[in-house]
UniProtKB/Swiss-Prot annotation:
A divalent metal cation binds at residues 10, 12, 44. It comes from Burkholderia pseudomallei (strain 1710b). GO terms for biological process: isopentenyl diphosphate biosynthetic process, methylerythritol 4-phosphate pathway; terpenoid biosynthetic process. Disulfide bonds: none annotated. This is 2-C-methyl-D-erythritol 2,4-cyclodiphosphate synthase. The lineage of its organism: Bacteria, Pseudomonadati, Pseudomonadota, Betaproteobacteria, Burkholderiales.
Length: 162
């Protein structure tokens, strides 16, 4: 069996006038994340981790932020397409672990819904998807509430040809 690990990272600036969508969940907050798509920082990090694990490049290679087709795109749809491309490359997704770093808002009440969305989009059992939320202890741009960051790791496997 051919096991592969990928890691992903994303960060977006918090700005007024946009919804805050993380893990496919709309979170009540006075600011949202700035981006070409819906700017779902968590799903972008997971997408990058999956593409990386399968050696398929990164999210920008597949869903360019200069391509008008992806303007305002639903990152859950992008994640599902990523999973399809990973499968077409011969890999099965085994698990995803992720961390969101945000000073505010509190994300703990939304984590179960995020996990459920990710598990559904990747066709994984819930116990193979983990989401953690941390603050940056008021340090740096994250601590000042200027943005939100996410990191992710993914494990994929390709069975050896018989």
């Amino acid at each position: 069996m051919d096991f592969r690990i990928g890691q992903g990272y994303d960060v977006h600036q918090l700005v007024p006038g946009r919804p805050l969508i993380i893990g496919g969940v709309t979170i009540p907050y006075e600011r949202g994340l700035l981006g070409h798509s819906d700017a779902d920082v968590l799903l972008h990090a997971i997408t990058d981790a999956l593409f990386g694990a399968a050696a398929l490049g990164d999210i920008g290679r597949h869903f360019s932020d200069t391509d008008p087709r992806f303007k305002g795109a639903d990152s859950r749809a992008l994640l599902r397409e990523c999973a399809s491309r990973v499968a077409q490359a011969g890999f099965a997704i085994r698990n995803v672990d992720s961390t969101i770093i945000a000073q505010a808002p509190k994300l703990a009440p939304h984590i179960d819904a995020m996990r459920a969305n990710i598990a559904a989009d990747l066709d994984l059992p819930l116990d193979r998807v983990n989401v953690k939320a941390k603050t940056n202890e008021k340090l740096g741009y994250l601590g000042r509430g200027e943005g939100i960051e996410a990191q992710a790791a993914a494990l994929v496997v390709r069975e050896a040809a018989a």
